[in-house]
Amino acid sequence: MPFRSNNPLTRDELLSRFFPQFHPVTTFNSGLSGGSFLIEHQGQRFVVRQPHDPDAPQSAFLRQYRALSQLPACIAPKPHLYLRDWMVVDYLPGEVKTYLPDTNELAGLLYYLHQQPRFGWRITLLPLLELYWQQSDPARRTVGWLRMLKRLRKAREPRLLRLSPLHMDVHAGNLVHSASGLKLIDWEYAGDGDIALELAAVWVENTDQHRQLVNDYATRAKIYPAQLWRQVRRWFPWLLMLKAGWFEYRWRQTGDQQFIRLADDTWRQLLIKQ
């Protein structure tokens, strides 16, 4: 249910107006993007979310609501309420582990997602790369960063292999191991893009695991594994630049030292892969 309001509500106002019988249970602070909190009434639970990026346009938060509204409940939480600065979605019972599931199981989840109807908006990386450059700490803007940005701008994004709806933030912390199978949470970066971009963006432990995930996906998608892996590799510079830029952007927003450490590590990976 979308609900429009020009004036953002406080947490207490939200609960008293829309969920008067519910009470907060716990706050989630895991992950790099921010937290949310859980509300409960007689065994029924919802997750109350706010935009992770306070500087992002409201349209980005609305897109997340729209994506969840059209996705099947077997892979994503169903939304119940959207209004300015707040979204309420189903709580997904299950276990969030610290490591990825079996690559074949994960490939099956991603392939099923990629068979769903498209969201209706494209993921384009270059505007994000340029935004992160502009919004980063000037003292952190290096000649090498600018050189790589210009190189990608000139090269342009790889040609699409297959255009599908993507999650774009697949890692162990966003996967719920439920009784009915794997499900994905945190859909704030979702949009339509190349399936190989999604596979390139998965937070894997090592190259062997990455290759196996791509091979398992290729089998389901009836694509030659070598062809799919080549396409995944074409996206690597874009993804590493995206991660490094996002970490730099979040460092300037929050001052949290973990983002500097992650940015430095990603810059080192970029140098190795050039």
From Swiss-Prot:
Organism per entry: Escherichia coli O6:H1 (strain CFT073 / ATCC 700928 / UPEC)
UniProt keyword Nucleotide-binding, yes or no: yes
GO molecular function: ATP binding; thiamine kinase activity
Pathway(s) annotated for this protein in UniProt: Cofactor biosynthesis; thiamine diphosphate biosynthesis; thiamine phosphate from thiamine: step 1/1
Catalytic activity: thiamine + ATP = thiamine phosphate + ADP + H(+)
Family of this protein: Belongs to the thiamine kinase family.
Enzyme Commission no: 2.7.1.89
Function: Catalyzes the ATP-dependent phosphorylation of thiamine to thiamine phosphate. Is involved in thiamine salvage.
Keyword Transmembrane: no
Gene Ontology biological process: thiamine diphosphate biosynthetic process; thiamine metabolic process
The protein's enzyme class: transferase
Classification via InterPro entries: Aminoglycoside_PTrfase, Kinase-like_dom_sf, Thiamine_kinase
Short name of one Pfam family: APH
Transmembrane domains' residue ranges: none
Protein name, UniProt field: Thiamine kinase
Keyword line: ATP-binding, Kinase, Nucleotide-binding, Transferase
Gene3D superfamilies in the record: 3.90.1200.10
